[in-house]
A protein has these predicted regions:
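Cap/lid segment of the alpha/beta-hydrolase catalytic domain
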Residues: 36-67, 71-160, 165-167
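N-terminal targeting or regulatory segments adjacent to alpha/beta-hydrolase or S9 domains
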Residues: 1-45
Length: 171
């Protein structure tokens, strides 16, 4: 470990760079889809880590925070229900970024509401989130929690018309 301090510093700077890129990309969502969609980002709570790094710490067993993007067509009417698409991003250590803007635009044009979780292990939130990956386990719970959040908190979501789409790690 003594011979590896440069590696640790490099890893920290990579995560810091990812966080900066995420903040820039968050602004770009408004540029890419803001003309047709209301864009929001919420913090949700998922199950505790699958394995605590320090099981005796005060935070051991606490719920894990993650973020989710919400895209709602600007054309929605309050007295109508709309279908929901749950869209987990692909890539084990990736994130929901504007790479997907063309897909979000198409879904919004068809009057779908979209929720897209940046589940545990996603990039752009620092080493803590990145290292919480469960490789197909608890990330699924995070995605399901984002679905439930939409159904429980948005009266315009039709709970009988909920779909999921994705590919690779998100599919």
């Amino acid at each position: 470990l003594c011979s590896m301090p440069g590696v640790v510093r490099a890893q920290l700077s990579v995560h810091q760079f990812d966080q900066l890129m995420k903040k820039i990309d968050d602004v770009l969502w408004y540029e890419k889809v803001g003309d047709i969609a209301h864009v929001d980002k919420v913090i949700l709570c998922g199950p505790p880590r699958w394995k605590e790094f320090n099981p005796t710490s005060m935070s051991a067993g606490n719920e894990l925070k993650f973020r989710a993007y919400i895209f709602i067509p600007k054309s929605v009417k309050e007295n109508k229900k709309y279908p929901l698409i749950v869209f987990p991003h692909s890539g084990v250590h990736a994130d929901m970024d504007t790479y997907y803007a063309h897909i979000i635009r198409e879904l919004i044009a068809q009057e779908y509401i979209v929720v897209a979780a940046d589940y545990r292990g996603s990039t752009g939130y620092g080493a803590g989130t990145y290292n919480n990956i469960d490789y197909g386990g608890l990330e699924n719970e995070d995605v399901y929690i984002s679905r439930n959040y939409m159904v429980d908190n948005f009266d315009i979501v039709d709970s009988s018309r909920v779909g999921i789409m994705g590919w690779s790690h998100g599919g």
